[in-house]
Amino acid sequence: MPRKGPVAKRDVLPDPIYNSKLVTRLINRVMVDGKRGIAANIIYNSFDIIKESTGNDPLEVFEQAMKNVMPVLEVKARRVGGSNYQVPVEVRPERRTTLGLRWVVNYARLRGEHTMEERLAKEIMDAANNTGASVKKREDTHKMADANRAFAHYRW
C-alpha cells in the first residue's frame, strides 16, 4: 500500500486503426517481452481473418465475444472460524474486462492452430458464438458461484 494515497489509474490510448481502448488492452495482453509491434500485427491479422471468415465487422465480433466471456460472479476465499469458504461475489466492471481478455488470450494460446493469428481469430469467433474454452471457463466460474450460494451471507 503506497503511503501517498491511492495510485492513479493509467488510461490506455485507443488503438490507431479501430479507435478502441478494448483493442489496445487486447494488444497489451498479447504482447510478450514488450514487443508491441508484433502483438499489434497479431491482433490486426487475426481481425482480418475474422473479417474474411464471418463477413462482419471484426470489432463487433470481438465486442460480442467479450460480452459472452466476461463473468458476472466469481468466488473468493473467506476464512471464518477456522475454515475457508468460497464466497460468491459480484465482479467489478474493470475486473470483468480484464478476466475476459485474459481468458480469451490464454485459451487462444492453448489451441492447436498453426499461428497465433489463427488461434486468436478462432477463439474470438467461438466466443462470439457462445462456444469455445473461454466461454466454458466463464460458465464454470458461474457454476462455482451458484454452487456456493449458501455462503453468500459471508460477503464483505
Swiss-Prot record:
PROSITE patterns per record = RIBOSOMAL_S7
Q: Indicate whether Aminoacyl-tRNA synthetase appears among the record's keywords.
A: no
Query: Which domain of life does this protein belong to?
Result: Bacteria
Query: Which residue ranges does UniProt annotate as crossing the membrane?
Result: none
Give this protein's Gene Ontology molecular function annotations.
rRNA binding; structural constituent of ribosome; tRNA binding
Q: Return the CDD domains for the record.
A: uS7_Bacteria (cd14869)
Q: May I have one GO cellular component term?
A: small ribosomal subunit
Q: Which residues form a coiled coil?
A: none
The UniProt entry, under InterPro entries, shows:
Ribosomal_uS7 (IPR000235), Ribosomal_uS7_bac/org-type (IPR005717), Ribosomal_uS7_CS (IPR020606), Ribosomal_uS7_dom (IPR023798), Ribosomal_uS7_dom_sf (IPR036823)
What SUPFAM superfamilies does its record include? Ribosomal protein S7 (SSF47973)
Q: Does the keyword rRNA-binding apply?
A: yes
Q: What processes does the entry annotate via GO biological process terms?
A: translation
- Which keywords has UniProt assigned to this entry? Ribonucleoprotein, Ribosomal protein, RNA-binding, rRNA-binding, tRNA-binding
Q: Which HAMAP family match?
A: Ribosomal_uS7_B
Question: What is the role of the protein in this entry?
Answer: One of the primary rRNA binding proteins, it binds directly to 16S rRNA where it nucleates assembly of the head domain of the 30S subunit. Is located at the subunit interface close to the decoding center, probably blocks exit of the E-site tRNA.
The UniProt subunit note reads as follows:
Part of the 30S ribosomal subunit. Contacts proteins S9 and S11.
Matching NCBIfam families:
rpsG_bact
The record's family statement is: Belongs to the universal ribosomal protein uS7 family.
The molecule here is called: Small ribosomal subunit protein uS7
Instruction: List the top taxonomic levels of the source.
Output: Bacteria, Bacillati, Bacillota, Bacilli, Lactobacillales
